[in-house]
Amino acid sequence: MIDFVCMEGEQMNTKINQLLEYALKNGMIEEYDYDYCANLLIDLFGIYEFKREQVEECSIYEILEFMLDYAVEKGMIQDTVTEKDLLDTRIMNCVMPRPSEVVNTFKSLYSLNPKSATDYFYKLSMDSNYIRKSRIDKNISFAHFCKYGDIQITINLSKPEKDPKEIAKAKNAVSTSYPACLLCKENVGFAGNLNHPARQTHRIIPLDLNGHTYNLQYSPYVYYNEHCIVFNSEHTPMKMDRSTFEHLFAFIDKFPHYMIGSNADLPIVGGSILSHDHYQGGRHHFPMEDAKAVKSYTYKDVQVDMLYWPLSTLRLTSESKENVLDLATKIFETWCTYSDESLDIIANEDGVRHNTVTPIVRKVGDKYQMDVVLRNNRTTEEYPLGIFHPHSEHHHIKKENIGLIEVMGLAILPARLKTELEEIKLCLSGKADFYSYPELEKHKEWYEYLKTCSYTNVDTFMEMEVTKKFVSVLENAGVYKMDDEGMDGFSRFVKTLW
């Protein structure tokens, strides 16, 4: 903790100046805003005067750390991650442009170049600490080659874990239904609480997608470069139909330098939020894009490739957007009623639909390209969490739904693995006893296998083994396996399309 006994007022005055200079330098405020923003900040901290001074440049993280420590020392907040996050968002809001200013700047830049507009918006999201880059930089990431190509792995450390006291306090906090969910447009400017993150630095850009109003924002956790979310202005559930595909293509027409996709609309094979219609996009090269074709067809000027990929995928490529849309709709509607009981694929049971798709759209030169990934969410006694879902022998690494991002070959693995994998390395190296770590019990069977393997570098070895596990998880999620039986089944389905 910083010692505030001496000159604390002068130190805070300096930090406020440094924050204002940071905001000026990064185009968040203009010179005419300086006094206004200074007054917002001194009011926030209960300070009664401010003096402008020449200051040395300082990182935003150092500035915020000082201000948060000051607030803890003064009893404004408790020394917890949640309360600090609520306050530092409130601090940054004092130097944020209003939502209308952001929208107008975006539109002005867009009229010149769509990429300039998204560059501005993404930079603002980073500069404002809405995207907490200092935390995201802690994520562990690596890539290793497998039979399907390079697979990307991340261990996500950007969401801080709450301590028991925070959890207890949050449990006793007043519960509200406003905003209805984390995606609703009403989050813009929301101060947050112990159960809902502050969103005062959150900004959104309205979009017309084929006559429907959506909004563009960036994910505060950016799982990949320029990870954006495009959400419906209304709090309405996810759905999958032709209009979904039309929205994806409309987005790509507006932002051809981005890709976009949608999670499936059913539990188990869908994402974590099914209650609010949304898509995810960004500017990142996913492993799936390099997948090779096993078989190729042509249908009404559309090239159709059956991909060599763990999840069963048909890739549609054409200069004609309408032809791709028509064929994608036909694939989806046919798949929704298609069954192949020999491969455990049953479309409907007791009036409940099990088949759906995960669609992904991108531009490749002048051509439209759409990946249609076939999904099924059936459960059985043997597989109560899903037949085409990570199986129990892999849950020690990944047990969550395989959503859009994982479908494309980017693993988002839980933070616990950072510590657990390091402990396993120590055990493999003979520097620790496996049974002295209770949290490793879930890895016991895997560890027994790892002990039988030969390797020269334990770090590289463990990365490769984690990659193998993730690939196995993706293969579990594929409705048609990449073997003779599976490919024959896949071909039978494709033949029903023409």
Residue ranges of each PLM-predicted region?
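Beta-rich nucleic-acid/ligand-interaction surfaces
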Residues: 267-275, 350-355
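Histidine-centered divalent-metal-coordination microenvironment in nucleic-acid enzymes
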Residues: 226-232, 270-286, 373
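Catalytic or ion-translocation cores adjacent to nucleophile or general acid/base/metal-coordination motifs
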Residues: 252-272, 281-339
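Generic alpha-helical secondary structure signal
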Residues: 242-246, 321-329, 468
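Active-site microenvironments that recognize anionic phosphate/pyrophosphate groups
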Residues: 5-230, 234-237, 308-310, 325-328, ...
